[in-house]
Curated annotation (Swiss-Prot):
Swiss-Prot/TrEMBL Gelsolin-like repeat ranges: 509-591, 629-703, 758-831, 1075-1143, 1181-1254
Protein name: Protein flightless-1 homolog
PTM annotation (N6-acetyllysine): residues: 21
Cystine bridges: none
GO CC terms in record: actin cytoskeleton; brush border; cell projection; centriolar satellite; cytoplasm; cytosol; focal adhesion; nucleoplasm
Span list, region Interaction with ACTL6A: 495-827
N-acetylmethionine: residues bearing it: 1
Taxonomic source organism: Homo sapiens (Human)
Task of the protein: Is a regulator of actin polymerization, required for proper myofibril organization and regulation of the length of sarcomeric thin filaments. It also plays a role in the assembly of cardiomyocyte cell adhesion complexes. Regulates cytoskeletal rearrangements involved in cytokinesis and cell migration, by inhibiting Rac1-dependent paxillin phosphorylation. May play a role as coactivator in transcriptional activation by hormone-activated nuclear receptors (NR) and acts in cooperation with NCOA2 and CARM1. Involved in estrogen hormone signaling.
Length: 1269
């Protein structure tokens, strides 16, 4: 692999995470003669490899987290070695060689987390030491002579040892900036050396037994000390010496015994972080409000109550985090909510009763933790906060405007909706600081003046153009304008805004930015765009634009360079011309741009045009593993690689096989099949054939690709198999050197998609780690991928391809390992599977509110308005503002009923009995049962369209000229024949299963279609959702009984029926309801059927007429009583108040209070709120709605004239709930302005918990039915 010739140019490489156990180490490292830094962390090394001796220029060596017991070997022979990092090993004192401290340049030594019992011998000879870390060992003493020579130390970490004292020579460390002594028993150490360390910036003394007596009295000389940690000690108050630190920024005093704070804390004017958790504080002094730069304040686990927090805490305008968990707080000061930058507020485990109402105006808040406060009641959210719900403006004025209301109506609604002043307005004003308000006012004034000036200039230009003679020709540059094309991807906002040189190279039809290191180097087969930005004599920006044509460049590159150069000029608004420069014939002005120092390089990028050639596919086989997101592991291309517990994918280019083992899961098989579909769609243009194979049923072609069928397919993959962790390298290229650092993606986060509050370490690769301007190498052990960013330099790409080959051959890999190249935007599916949630779909944030859109950077003027319009979610609330559907008059309904029945030529009924449809007896017409299915075949007469009257008269005259019967017969033959139409109505009870519809579809429907070809229409209906034309055939005598038509007769119970008309007399039904006297209503008629046990008299049927019922309905009730119920029952019509006690009230189950009016019938409306159209929309159900119109996955709004009920189904999404709540509020506000005498109240109803005021709006309310098959 040395043929690539790149190893001598490698200056740094990170080989961490590879397995170098057992004495193996890649010999190719010796060829990296220019290596400056080398990382071998977590590689399993037990001793230093001999190959290090060849790295004579090595300066930094890191061998952390290994199994090293000694550093003896080649280290002392590396003359340039500056840094040795050997933390987290098993080093003892005998394993640290003395001769390494004789290296002249050794300045960094990290031997932390080892087994040292004393300081390494000869350490004092390392006179140039700058960083020394001996923490987490067992060192008990520090020799006095150590710090006699190490006077240049900048960083010293001796934490987590057994030190009881410190040498006095430490006072010589006048350059020391960081001192860490955590976890040492320094009870008797007075730390008198500290005042002498004048350069100290960080001092950590956590858990060092500090008290008031063993700290220096003053640290006034430490003017640079900014970070102090005195946590986990025995301090009862803040040490006086801390008040003398002028530059203190971070102070940790947690886990002490501090009971109070001094008023002197106002001297910490620069403090940004103050941690006082786990102390005994009962109050904070008011002086803490003077810490104007404080950003983080931690007060957890103290004894603070409401009086202990100063009322002026709102003066901390820079406060971002406030934590006071596990205290005795019942309230928090209202001023705390005036901290405009507060992001994190933690108040859990307190005794909170409520929070200030201004808590809702903390716009930057990300974390609000109030858990374990059992008596907490959150304050109500402020009303009328428009445009904050999923970027939809729910204000009444805006929704009326969208619904097409007139401006007068909108203005009237605005006037009616403007009530008293918002009590929260004052808190909102208090939240804004005085200085920011002045800045905003100044900006508004400047903006207003600018707008006025621009408008004035525009009018002057228009008037000047109007006065100019029409024959005058405008100059070419006066017509320049920015192109409408989107060039932001190629030319960034700062292009041409700073003096300097910018160069683009044409690649695949588009300009790609060239790094500054490669300016002046031109490929002979390429074209370039050169932009020179400079300041003219007046101090204004000016530009020169050239496009350079290579001698071997193709036509497409020449054309694109000229086009993009012109668009760049228009993009900048420049008045200069674009100058063409050809290779070998450059102008003097062009050469001066590069100081006459340009060079030509052979070669160039490929043409942007497609070349027709056959694609070569490499046959590979992968083992599929993983549960939630599958991954593919390459395996050798032979039959013995198969395992019956897994699914394998064999990729042969245009033939893809998915092999399922006998013990593989169906889920893995399905996911592997989907994975193959993605490969076919994205990489094979849909031309590949995917074949699913099951173990034991393989095709000969499958075994041919694997070199033959094995004798037996065995289990050979270990149960705990998991492939090595992928390693992501970033290729770095400088002047004459290459670097290959690893990206520690274990600590990476999805910073582009996830909010800050959810930033947690993820041990997965993320797509956001890949920068389009860079090149990366992804080492997956059995696969090495080279990812090329679209804007990456060409030389970096070439170097990466060679480095990938070297890296593949450098380590022990299986024979089937390959190196593949992936271009940004055309990545292979196998490469994408290595990343977490690789997403090719454009991300759209539907939760962004209007304020977030307005704060989008880089938006101004019309662009800003366009962005707002684009980001707004569509919502349709028009139905809320339409008037209620007026009821149909009785005369109109009867006329319509008469017309439909005149057209009816005949009707036959069928009912499902068992598995067949039987003919329905005529005496049962109009009777329906909730558990049955019915079919009605209706034959309608279709009127004949006769010819015009004149032609008809002519025909009659001609007919008169003929004689007798012959003329009459001829006239009759010419008359058009009457036509007919057949409609089959299928009616299904709400308790019937769907088997009735399936039975009808496959039996009766086919028979009807054969009898009436081309003239049959099928209408499917469910109970109480019938077609009005169908209802008209029963002439308002439509009775729905509960149960089945031929149910097993047992002890009969009384049954109660309600007659009700919904919106029109056509929609009149008599439906059986629960036998309960509380369901009676004075405005309706009811029928009560009471059976007797006597054989002579079957029972009695009462028609109960309410005192306020409609007379027409009373007549209808009497008619139904007499004609539709069994003649064996005696019948009686009774008025309300005249009920017989013996049979009526006994039969109905005792007398109970019931409603005496149905005023709600005049106002009831039902709306549906849904996202099924792809956006939020509200639609209104017709006035003849029923219980089954309540969709379980949507929100329903029911208005009864007094209350608006928001009904929530069990499968409703949270998005619909939030949007429907705002829509409901808009509707109530609209009705308040429209019917101010009937103000509505909002009520929430969940499915299954409906109250009587809600259910009475529905005819024959009963328990919800479960979904039936």
């Amino acid at each position: 692999m040395e043929a690539t010739g790149v190893l001598p140019f490698v200056r740094g490489v990170d080989l961490s995470g590879n397995d170098f156990k057992g004495g193996y180490f890649p010999e190719n490292v010796k060829a990296m003669t220019s290596l400056r830094w080398l990382k071998l962390n977590r590689t399993g090394l037990c001793y230093l490899p001999e190959e290090l001796a060849a790295l004579q220029k090595l300066e930094h060596l890191s061998v952390s987290h290994n199994n090293l017991t000694t550093l003896h070997g080649e280290l002392s022979s590396l003359p340039s070695l500056r840094a040795i990092v050997a933390r987290a090993n098993s080093l003892k004192n005998s394993g640290v060689p003395d001769d390494i401290f004789k290296l002249d340049d050794l300045s960094v030594l990290d031997l932390s987390h080892n087994q040292l019992t004393e300081c390494p011998r000869e350490l004092e000879n390392a006179k140039n030491m700058l960083v020394l870390n001996l923490s987490h060992n067992s060192i008990d003493t520090i020799p006095n002579q150590l710090f006699i020579n190490l006077t240049d130390l900048l960083y010293l970490d001796l934490s987590e040892n057994r030190l009881e004292s410190l040498p006095p020579q430490m006072r010589r460390l006048v350059h020391l900036q960081t001192l860490v002594l955590n976890g040492n028993p320094l009870l008797h150490a007075q730390l008198r050396q500290l005042p002498a360390m004048t350069a100290l910036q960080t001092l950590h003394l956590r858990s060092t037994q500090r008290t008031q007596s063993n700290l220096p009295t003053s640290l006034e000389g430490l003017s640079n000390l900014a970070d102090v940690d005195l946590s986990c000690n025995d301090l009862t108050r803040v040490p006086e010496c801390l008040y003398t630190l002028p530059s203190l920024r971070r102070l940790n005093l947690s886990s002490n015994q501090i009971t109070e704070l001094s008023l002197c804390i106002d001297q910490w004017v620069h403090v940004e972080t103050l941690n006082l958790s786990r102390n005994q504080l009962t109050s904070l002094p008011s002086a803490i409000c003077k810490l104007s730069k404080l950003k983080k304040l931690y007060l957890n686990s103290n004894k603070l109550d409401f009086d202990g927090l100063p009322s002026g805490i709102g003066k901390l305008t820079n406060l971002e985090e406030f934590m006071a968990a596990n205290n005795n707080l019942e309230l928090v000061p209202e001023s705390l909510c005036r901290c405009p930058k507060l992001r994190k507020l933690v108040l859990n485990k307190n005794h909170l009763v409520t929070l200030p109402e201004a808590i809702h105006f903390l716009t930057e808040i990300e974390v609000l933790d109030v858990r374990e406060n059992p008596n907490l009641v959150m304050p109500p959210k402020p009303a009328d906060r428009a445009a904050e719900w999923y970027n939809i403006d729910f204000s009444l004025q805006n929704q009326l405007r969208l619904a097409g209301a007139s401006p007068a109506t909108v203005a009237a609604a605005a006037a009616a909706g403007s009530g008293p002043k918002d009590p929260m307005a004052r808190k909102m004003r208090l939240r804004r600081r005085k200085d920011s308000a002045q800045d905003d006012q100044a900006k508004q004034v400047l903006k207003g003046m600018s707008d006025v000036a621009q408008e004035k200039n525009k009018k002057q230009e228009e008037s000047a153009d109007a006065r100019a003679p029409s024959g005058k020709v405008r100059r070419w540059d006066q017509g320049l304008e920015k192109p409408r094309l989107d060039y932001s991807e190629f030319f960034t906002e700062d292009v041409g805004q700073l003096p300097g040189l910018t160069i683009w190279q044409i690649e695949n039809f588009v300009p790609v930015l060239v790094e500054e290191a490669f300016h002046g180097k031109f490929y002979e087969a390429d074209c370039y765009i050169v932009l020179k930005t400079f300041l003219d004599d007046s101090g204004s920006l000016n530009w020169e634009i050239y496009y350079w044509i290579g001698g071997e460049a193709t036509l497409d590159k020449k054309a694109c360079s000229a086009i993009h150069a012109v668009n760049l000029r228009n993009y900048l608004g420049a008045e200069c011309r674009t100058v063409r420069e050809e290779m070998g014939d450059e102008s003097e002005e062009f050469l001066q741009v590069f100081d006459n120092d340009i060079s030509y390089i052979e070669g160039g990028t490929a043409s942007g045009f497609y070349t027709v050639e056959d694609t070569h596919y490499v046959t590979r086989m992968y083992r599929v593993y993983g549960k939630k997101n599958i991954k593919l592991e390459p395996v050798p291309l032979k039959g013995t690689s198969l395992d019956p517990r897994f699914v394998f994918l064999l990729d042969r280019g245009l033939d893809i096989y998915v092999w399922r083992g006998a013990q593989a899961t169906l889920s893995s098989t399905t996911k592997a099949r989907l994975f193959a579909e993605k490969i076919n769609k994205n990489e094979r243009k849909g031309k590949a054939e995917i074949t699913l194979l099951v173990q034991g049923q393989e095709l000969p072609e499958f075994w041919e690709a694997l070199g033959g069928e094995p004798s037996e397919i065995k289990k050979h993959v270990p149960e705990d198999f998991w492939p090595p962790q992928p390693k992501l390298y970033k290729v770095g290229l400088g002047l004459g050197y290459l670097e290959l650092p690893q990206i520690n993606y274990k600590l990476s986060v999805e910073h582009k998609q996830r909010p800050k509050v959810e930033l947690m370490p993820r041990m997965r690769l993320l797509q956001s780690l890949l920068d389009t301007r860079c090149v990366y190498i992804l080492d997956c052990w059995s696969d090495v991928f080279i990812w090329l960013g679209r804007k990456s330099p060409r030389l970096v790409r070439a170097a990466a391809l060679k480095l990938g080959q070297e890296l593949c051959g450098m380590l022990h890999r299986p024979r089937h390992a390959t190196v593949s190249r992936s271009l940004e935007g055309t990545e292979a599916q196998v490469f994408k599977a290595k990343f977490k949630n690789w997403d090719d779909v454009l991300t759209v944030d539907y939760t962004r509110n209007a304020e977030a859109v307005l704060q989008s950077p880089g938006l101004s003027g019309k662009v800003k308005r366009d962005a707002e319009k684009k980001d707004q979610m569509k919502a349709d609330l028009t139905a809320l503002f339409l008037p209620r559907q007026p009821p149909m008059s009785l005369a109109e309904a009867e006329q319509l009923m008469e017309e439909w029945n005149e057209d009816l030529d005949g009707m036959e009924g069928f009912v499902l009995e068992g598995k067949k449809f039987a003919r329905l007896p005529e005496e049962e017409f109009g009777h329906f049962y909730t558990q049955d299915c019915y079919v009605f075949l209706c034959r309608y007469w279709v009127p004949v369209e006769y010819e015009e009257e004149e032609k008809k008269e002519d025909k009659e005259e001609k007919a008169e000229g003929k004689e007798g019967e012959e003329a009459t017969a001829e006239a009759e033959e010419k008359q058009p024949e009457e036509d007919f139409q057949c409609i089959v109505y299928f009616w299904q009870g709400r308790e019937a299963s769907n088997m009735g519809w399936l039975t009808f579809t496959f039996s009766l429907q086919k028979k009807f279609e054969s009898l009436f070809p081309g003239k049959l229409e099928v209408v499917r209906m469910t109970q109480q959702q019938e077609n009005p034309k169908f209802l008209s055939h029963f002439k308002r005598k439509f009775i729905i009984h509960r149960g089945k038509r031929k149910a097993v007769q047992g002890a009969q119970q009384p049954s109660l029926y309600q007659i009700r008309t919904n919106g029109s007399a056509l929609c009149t039904r008599c439906i059986q309801i629960n036998t309960d006297s509380s369901l009676l209503n004075s405005e309706f008629c009811f029928i009560l059927k009471v059976p007797f046990e006597s054989e002579d008299n079957q029972g009695i049927v009462y028609a109960w007429v309410g005192r306020a019922s409609d007379p027409d309905e009373a007549k209808l009730a009497e008619d139904i009583l007499n004609t539709m119920f069994d003649t064996s029952y005696s019948k009686q019509v009774i008025n309300e108040g005249e009920e017989p006690e013996n049979f009526f009230w006994v039969g109905i189950g005792a007398q109970k209070p019931y409603d005496d009016d149905a005023e709600y019938m005049k106002h009831t409306r039902l709306f549906r709120c849904s996202n099924e159209k792809g956006y939020f929309a509200v639609t209104e159900k017709c006035s003849d709605f029923c219980q089954d119109d309540l969709a379980d996955d949507d929100i329903m709004l029911l208005d009864n004239g007094q209350e608006v009920y928001m009904w929530v189904g069990t499968q409703t999404s949270q998005v619909e709930i939030k949007l429907s709540l705002k829509a409901c509020q808009v509707y109530i506000q609209h009705m308040r302005s429209k019917e101010h005498e009937r103000p509505r109240r909002l009520r929430l109803v969940r499915k299954g918990n409906e109250q009587h005021a809600f259910t009475r709006c529905f005819h024959a309310w009963s328990a919800f039915c479960k979904a039936l098959a």
